[in-house]
From Swiss-Prot:
Activity regulation annotation text: The formation of the proteasomal ATPase ARC-20S proteasome complex, likely via the docking of the C-termini of ARC into the intersubunit pockets in the alpha-rings, may trigger opening of the gate for substrate entry. Interconversion between the open-gate and close-gate conformations leads to a dynamic regulation of the 20S proteasome proteolysis activity.
Assigned keywords, A-Z: Autocatalytic cleavage, Cytoplasm, Hydrolase, Protease, Proteasome, Threonine protease, Zymogen
GO process terms (BP): modification-dependent protein catabolic process; proteasomal protein catabolic process
Protein name (Swiss-Prot/TrEMBL): Proteasome subunit beta
Reactions mediated catalytically: Cleavage of peptide bonds with very broad specificity
UniProt xrefs under Gene3D superfamilies: Glutamine Phosphoribosylpyrophosphate, subunit 1, domain 1
Length: 284
């Protein structure tokens, strides 16, 4: 051995921080909290006073026979300004779940990406996926970590949708879970829900259109109609923008196909049908 040769060269593992070599849980979030706590969402110091940051707006979820879906508008606002017209607010987080985000956009995006890694990390280490309740609880725990930011006005409100592969009845296996800013989680048993600034109008629309026995195409149409109604009354929610070719984002989750993003071409067809229909009947 050369006297100039370091031990880290001969034993590369010794160059790793202790956190990488210490046995722990199968939670990637727990590992990150020890190895690099500054990377955790909500761990950074919160500035005093109001902070102007882009906010995502309206997300809807509804169940149908054999699954569940998420749909969201594409607008992000900052105060009274439109910060972005084509923001993506829906994310597939594993084979049978997806999350829509409303609230402070930057923190929400960081949180949902870490959440997707958390689910993948658990599955790789344990060899099985988390149960649907386990997935929902993981997101609640992460949301609790942002409480300081939420109290300073940087709140995040995710909406979780998943297909319960262990359900007795696959036709009723779609699940929706909502959260509050403190990390409280709530199973939405009514079959539909909405979060964000236009949620009041979207839920009112879904109350009239929701059908638990609908097929996936009918449910998708109902979701886009609800987003249109929200945009009609809420300035922070963006409706279908045909001139800019910006359409709602939609993710469907079923037992056969898993979590699948509806192609933009199909979303464009549905949005165009809704807009044309409202020309004849503005109230829907």
């Amino acid at each position: 051995m050369s006297p100039m040769e370091s031990s880290s060269t001969r034993f590369p593992g010794q160059a790793l921080p202790a956190a990488y070599l210490t046995p722990g849980s199968s939670s990637f979030t727990d590992f990150l909290r020890v190895a690099a706590p500054e990377l955790m969402p909500g761990s950074r110091p919160v500035p005093d006073g109001a902070v102007e940051a882009p906010h995502g707006t309206t997300i809807v979820a509804l169940t149908f026979r054999g699954g569940v879906l998420l749909a969201g508008d594409r607008r992000a606002t900052m105060g009274n300004l439109i910060a972005q017209r084509d923001m993506e607010k829906l994310y597939v987080t594993d084979d049978y779940s997806a999350v829509g985000i409303a609230g402070t956009a930057g923190i929400a995006l960081e949180m949902v990406r870490l959440y997707a890694i958390e689910l993948e990390h658990y599955e790789k280490l344990e060899g099985v996926s988390l149960s649907l309740d386990g997935k929902a609880n993981k997101l609640a725990t992460m949301l609790r970590g942002n409480l300081q930011g939420a109290m300073a006005g940087l709140a995040v409100l995710p909406l979780f949708a998943g297909f319960d592969v262990d359900a007795d009845d696959p036709d009723r296996a779609g699940r929706i879970v909502s959260y509050d800013i403190t990390g409280g989680r709530y199973n939405e048993l009514g079959g539909y829900y909405a979060v964000g600034s236009g949620s009041l109008f979207a839920k009112s629309a879904l109350k009239k259109r929701f059908d638990p026995d609908a097929d996936v195409d009918t449910a998708v149409r109902a979701a886009v109609e609800a987003l249109y109604d929200a945009a009609d009354d809420d300035t922070a929610t963006g409706g279908p923008d045909l001139s800019r070719r910006i359409y709602p984002s939609i993710i469907t989750i079923t037992g056969t196909d898993g979590a699948t993003r509806v192609p933009e071409e199909r979303a464009a067809e549905i949005a165009t049908e809704v807009v044309n229909g409202r020309m004849q009947n503005p109230g829907g």
